[in-house]
Amino acid sequence: MSIATEIIGVPETLDHFQSDSYSPYHFFSSEQWAKFRADTPLTLTSDEVKRLRSMGDPIDLDEVRRIYLSLSRLLSAHVESSQMLFEQRNRFLSLSDVTKTPFVIGIAGSVAVGKSTTARVLKELLGRWPSSPKVDLVTTDGFLHPNAVLQREKLMQRKGFPESYDTAAILRFLSAIKAGQPDVKAPSYSHLVYDVLPDEYKIVDRPDILIFEGINVLQSRDLPAGGKIVPMVSDFFDFSIYIDAAEDLIHNWYVARFMRLRETAFRDPNSYFHRYASISDAEALEIAGDLWANINLKNLRQNILPTRPRADLILKKGKDHLIEQVALRKL
C-alpha cells in the first residue's frame, strides 16, 4: 500500500502521484527524493554510519545518499528561512541584540522503527553544514516517570503510553529551550536498568538546532475544562518528521531486536531484563510477541499512528528497513 493511500484513504489502485491533488502532501519514491540532493556533499564515512545506526538497522552510506542528503538540504532551507524571518521581524519591531532561539526538529514513530538512527544521522549531517551549527539531540526517554512512580500508579504495563511521561517536564524543558535559556537540563535514562537515572542530566546550552526524538512527540491532548490554554509538545517544533512502516514489519523488527538483545545487553547482570537471557528461544519469542501485542501495538494504534498526519515529513520504510517513500507537507 502506498503512503498516500494510508494517509488520505484514496483507492490503493490510484497511483500515489496522481493522488497528490487530494492530499496536503507531495509524495515521492526514494529514487525521486534522492535527486533533490543536488550538490549536497556526503560528509559521513561508512564507519561513522555504522557507529550511528541502532541494532538491527541496516542503514549504510547508500541510504544516507538516497534519503538523508536531500533531507539535510531541505532542513538547511528551513533553518535559513527561519533565520531570515527572525531578522525581518526584529527589524519590524526595531529590536537589536536579540539572539535567535533554537530551531527544533521533532522525530516521532513506533518503537523499533528506527527513530534513534534517523536522529543520530541527522545530528551529524546538520552539524557538518558549512555554517557549523551547534546541534543537540534529546530523547523523551528521560522524561518518563521513574519506575517507582509507574509502579505506584499501576502504569508499568503502559510504559511508553502518553500517561507514562512527565508531560509538564517536557513542556518546561522545551519552553526553556525556545526562550533561549542557557544550560537547560534534560533528564537521563538508562536502557540497561530500564529507568530514569536520578540526579543525572544532559546539559543543553543554547544550540542552533535541537532534535527532540520520541514515540509520542506529535501527540495532541484534550482541551482542558474552563478554556485554560495548555500547549502541546509539537507547538515548540519548527519541523517534524514521522518514521513510518507497516505494522507487520515493525512487529518483526521488534521481535528480532528482542532476540538479539538476549545475546547482548540482557546478559549483563545489571540489566532489568537479565531474566530473559537464560530462557529458551521459544519462550523468548512468545514473550516478545506478547509484549508487542499487549503494549507496543496498542500504543502504536491508539496514540502514535494517529499523529502521523501532523508531521511535516513522513519517511516510510519497507521490509528491508530502508526508506521507500517520502511524503512532504505542501506549503
UniProtKB/Swiss-Prot annotation:
A single GO BP annotation from the record?
coenzyme A biosynthetic process
Please provide, in alphabetical order, the Gene Ontology terms of the cellular component aspect for this entry. cytoplasm
Q: Which residues bind ATP?
A: 109-116
Highest taxon in the source lineage: Bacteria
Q: What GO MF annotations does this protein's record show?
A: ATP binding; pantothenate kinase activity
SUPFAM superfamilies, A to Z: P-loop containing nucleoside triphosphate hydrolases
Asked whether the UniProt record includes Kinase among its keywords, one would answer yes
InterPro entries hit by this protein: P-loop_NTPase, PanK, PRK/URK
The protein's matches in Pfam families, at most eight in alphabetical order, are given as: PRK
For the protein in the UniProt heading, the enzyme class is transferase
The cross-references to Gene3D superfamilies, in alphabetical order and at most eight, read: P-loop containing nucleotide triphosphate hydrolases
Task: Specify the signal sequence span.
Answer: none
Name listed for the protein in its UniProt record: Pantothenate kinase
Q: Which organism is it from?
A: Rhizobium leguminosarum bv. trifolii (strain WSM2304)
